[in-house]
């Protein structure tokens, strides 16, 4: 039987090392008194706008790397808007959402796959920055 946790932990550590030189704030998966299930690799691109985040996701997709945005703030959902919720009342939720990207994280990723994702993060970040997208 293959245990999933060590595989995910290896991938998370590989991402942490490989993305350390980018202005990405990665969610902490492991600490002295906690461990996550490792089902998402959430990264905040520090200082990035939604425009940059969206362009990053699109360009990563063009490079064959599926990225996403998770955890849309509830006030942005129609049901909550209809109840009178206003995203302006939740600035922290909006800030988290605005520059958050979810990178691939699953047990079928090989070391080469993770290295490719890391390399594309560097390349796409550099390309967008060179174009002046922020």
What are these regions (language model features)?
Residues 1-134:
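PLP-dependent aminotransferase class I/II
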């Amino acid at each position: 039987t293959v245990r999933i946790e060590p595989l995910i932990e290896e991938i998370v550590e590989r991402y942490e090392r490989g993305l350390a030189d980018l202005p990405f704030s990665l969610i902490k998966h492991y600490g002295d008194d906690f461990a996550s299930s490792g089902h998402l690799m959430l990264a905040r691109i520090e200082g990035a706008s939604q425009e940059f985040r969206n362009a990053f996701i699109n360009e990563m997709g063009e490079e064959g790397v599926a990225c996403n945005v998770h955890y849309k703030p509830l006030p942005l959902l129609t049901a909550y808007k209809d109840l009178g919720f206003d995203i302006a009342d939740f600035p922290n939720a909006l800030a988290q959402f605005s520059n958050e990207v979810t990178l691939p994280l699953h047990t079928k990723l090989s070391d080469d796959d993770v290295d490719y994702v890391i390399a594309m993060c560097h390349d796409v970040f550099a390309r967008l920055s060179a174009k002046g997208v922020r």
